[in-house]
């Protein structure tokens, strides 16, 4: 009986790989008997690593050796000593018990394997492949710092120098050094293979610093701009946890990722499938706007990972069709956006159904007080990783930004110039403020350039079809509302055009962030009109912060009184842009001169026109005596938001001076008595313009859309 157990242990133990004459001496190849992974062992230095060793150049000085340990020809004993060394190195207090457990495990396996196992080292990957040997927690087994040294991987940059170079700051105790190369991560070979086949040569800064923290079972708050590689920053540690725990996926997911929009959710799902395929990790995506039936069937088959929007997940939880009792790894992606959209109650309701002993990772592009509050409530002693300056909104410096100060009738001609200047087939996103304008532009551009529209009124099937054609290049121009500003992760977008300026510089930064992703460069064009002047000051700060040139026209607009209300965007719910609050959506404001982007505005007749032209949306009420009612969609009318938690984000019911209203708003003409248009083309309209407004000659094309 004892001999049979010893034989079984020997069969499962590591063994020498076939001789490889290309390996530099004295390195030897070894094969893990449990997983079949190939790794390498140096009998002289006792180093163990997964990356293939290379002979050091003759002129290079020898790498600094770790403190001298007694040499022992017994690799198994040296491995136990290495395990003890790992326990003494940089492990936080709550992790030391786990390291002691691993060291005991090494010794037990060495004794059970007999004399054969004493001839080859036992790596940490053996414990990762055997879930029963691990403590029952959500921790991932993290590679020790001395197993994959930076010297072995060819990068001798110090952690401090790497952090300074990439503007990484850490808030919290005992944060491990970043993984500056993929070889230093110790990830399983199949995961490394998927990452390298995807074309990544090195971890992004957020990945480099968040991976070692996540693998130590620490909660994380990661503050980084969009396009920084955060998706893999939380997915890969989740994969490693799944491989270790090996829960029954039919009993519920182990990893839960919450996302603000269905576009972002589906893209996270695509990444999970792509990089988890070789590890046989299953995932399901739950989002609104699509039938529940197929999603419920996918859940019944079992899913290791669930990626969900808060609203749809709450619906399914109320149906009792999914259980979260197994979730031990929770991710809140774009947490600031979820709070901005009013999802905080749904998030808290979901978290109540997740076990308290979990690991929570929060990724956000900004760090306002609302995000700080929910982080303090949901996370336990987190390590905060900041990439860049978190005290102010900054744009990606890889994006070249051009701001054209123009009038609304000039937009169409300028857009045509931009599109003609691009290489054929270049992927371009054009952002508009209204759904109707999206459809209008897409129809006008479709024949010559190939364009499609995406916004909240599109069905999920239509959205999927449009995004599929855009990704494939069959339809290289995408016209979108802000629903696509966050969530779209298409790495080869060349140009972003802000046809209409958004309702705040934070949305501007997220819009242009669709280009210049994953280390690439991009170009952003923005049309900036008089009614956008209230954002001029903040826009100049964004441009200067990204080392972009600022036109004299834009500076003149600032000097004439264009302002952004606050030098920083971290405003409370009663004094941020347009009364916008993270928890309460959009508030109602009452003022004579309307200078904010949202709200219900009440003023007197004398200020009606000036206030109207200083806004993009709102309910405008002038002196109703003798007024007629007109409804228009030139800026934004009757626009419901793309998420159910929003109040109507751009909703205009305009009682005003019916005689001069058309001329006051985006006025231009093709015929002197034409005031109604067909929505199938660009709007042509005419009224007698006031003398103090600038107009194009008759026959010029305007861009507003009428909605009678």
Curated annotation (Swiss-Prot):
Motif DEAD box — list its residue ranges: 333-336
Region (Disordered) residue spans: 1-29, 48-138, 560-708
Q: Where does ATP bind?
A: 224-231
Localization recorded for this chain is: Nucleus
Q: Name one GO cellular component term.
A: nucleus
Q: Which SUPFAM superfamilies match?
A: P-loop containing nucleoside triphosphate hydrolases, WW domain
Annotated function: ATP-dependent RNA helicase involved nonsense-mediated mRNA decay and ribosome biogenesis through rRNA processing.
Q: What is this protein called?
A: DEAD-box ATP-dependent RNA helicase 14
Species this chain originates from: Oryza sativa subsp. japonica (Rice)
């Amino acid at each position: 009986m004892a001999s049979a157990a010893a034989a079984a242990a020997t069969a499962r133990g590591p063994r020498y790989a076939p001789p490889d004459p290309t390996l530099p001496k004295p390195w030897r190849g070894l094969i893990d008997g449990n997983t079949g992974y190939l790794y390498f062992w140096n009998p002289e230095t006792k180093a163990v690593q997964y990356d293939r060793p290379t002979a050091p150049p003759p002129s290079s000085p020898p790498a600094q050796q770790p403190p001298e340990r007694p040499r022992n020809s017994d690799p198994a004993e040296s491995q136990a000593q290495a395990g003890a060394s790992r326990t003494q190195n940089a492990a936080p207090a709550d992790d030391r018990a786990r390291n002691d457990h691993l060291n005991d495990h090494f010794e037990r396996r060495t004794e059970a394997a007999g004399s054969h196992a004493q001839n080859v080292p036992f790596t940490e990957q053996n414990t990762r492949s055997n879930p029963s040997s691990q403590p029952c927690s959500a921790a991932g087994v993290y590679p020790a710092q001395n197993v994959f040294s930076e010297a072995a991987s060819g990068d001798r940059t110090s952690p401090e120098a790497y952090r300074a170079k990439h503007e990484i700051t850490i808030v919290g105790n005992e944060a491990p050094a970043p993984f500056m190369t993929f070889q230093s991560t110790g990830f399983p070979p199949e995961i490394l293979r998927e990452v390298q086949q995807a074309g990544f040569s090195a971890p992004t800064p957020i990945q480099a610093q968040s991976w070692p923290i996540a693998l130590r079972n620490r909660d994380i708050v990661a503050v980084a701009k969009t396009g920084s590689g955060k998706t893999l920053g939380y997915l890969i540690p989740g994969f490693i946890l799944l491989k270790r725990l090996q829960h029954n996926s039919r009993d519920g997911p182990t990893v839960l990722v919450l996302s603000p929009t269905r576009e972002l959710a589906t893209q996270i799902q695509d990444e999970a499938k792509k990089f988890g395929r070789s590890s046989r990790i299953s995932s399901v995506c739950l989002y609104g706007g699509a039938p529940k039936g197929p999603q419920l069937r996918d859940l019944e088959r079992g899913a290791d990972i669930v990626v969900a929007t808060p609203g749809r997940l709450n619906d399914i939880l109320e149906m009792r069709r999914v259980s979260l009792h197994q979730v031990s790894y929770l991710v809140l992606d774009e947490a600031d956006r979820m709070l901005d959209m009013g999802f905080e109650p749904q998030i808290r309701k979901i978290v109540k159904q997740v076990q308290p002993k979990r690991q929570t990772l929060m990724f956000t592009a900004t760090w306002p007080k609302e995000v700080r509050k929910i982080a303090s409530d949901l996370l336990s002693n987190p390590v905060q990783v900041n990439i860049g300056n978190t005290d102010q909104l900054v744009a990606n410096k890889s994006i070249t930004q051009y701001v054209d100060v123009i009038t609304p009738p000039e937009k169409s001609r300028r857009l045509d110039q931009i599109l003609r200047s691009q290489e054929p087939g270049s992927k371009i996103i054009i952002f508009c403020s209204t759904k109707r304008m999206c459809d209008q532009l897409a129809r006008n551009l479709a024949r010559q350039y190939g364009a499609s529209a995406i916004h909240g009124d599109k069905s999920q099937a239509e959205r999927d079809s449009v995004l599929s054609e855009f990704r494939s290049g069959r339809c290289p121009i995408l016209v979108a509302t802000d629903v696509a500003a966050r969530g779209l992760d298409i790495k080869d977008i060349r140009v972003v055009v802000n046809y209409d300026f958004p309702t705040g510089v934070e949305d501007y930064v997220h819009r242009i962030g669709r280009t210049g992703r994953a280390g690439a460069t991009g170009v952003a064009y923005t049309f900036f009109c008089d009614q956008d002047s209230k954002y001029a000051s903040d826009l100049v700060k964004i441009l200067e912060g990204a080392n972009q040139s600022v036109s004299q026209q834009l500076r003149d607009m600032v000097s004439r009184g264009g302002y952004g209300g606050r030098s920083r965007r971290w405003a409370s719910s009663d004094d941020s842009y347009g009364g916008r609050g993270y928890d309460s959506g959009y508030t109602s404001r009452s003022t004579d001169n309307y200078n904010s982007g949202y709200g219900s505005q009440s003023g007197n007749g004398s200020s009606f026109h000036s206030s109207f032209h200083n806004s993009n949306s709102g309910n405008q009420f002038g002196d109703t005596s003798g007024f007629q009612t007109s409804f228009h969609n030139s800026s934004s009318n009757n626009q419901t938001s793309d998420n159910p938690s929003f109040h109507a984000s751009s909703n205009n019911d305009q009682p005003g001076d019916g005689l001069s209203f058309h001329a006051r708003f985006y006025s231009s003409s093709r015929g002197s008595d034409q005031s109604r248009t067909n929505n199938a083309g660009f709007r042509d309209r005419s009224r007698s313009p006031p003398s103090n407004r600038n107009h194009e000659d008759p026959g010029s094309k305007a861009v507003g859309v009428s909605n009678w």
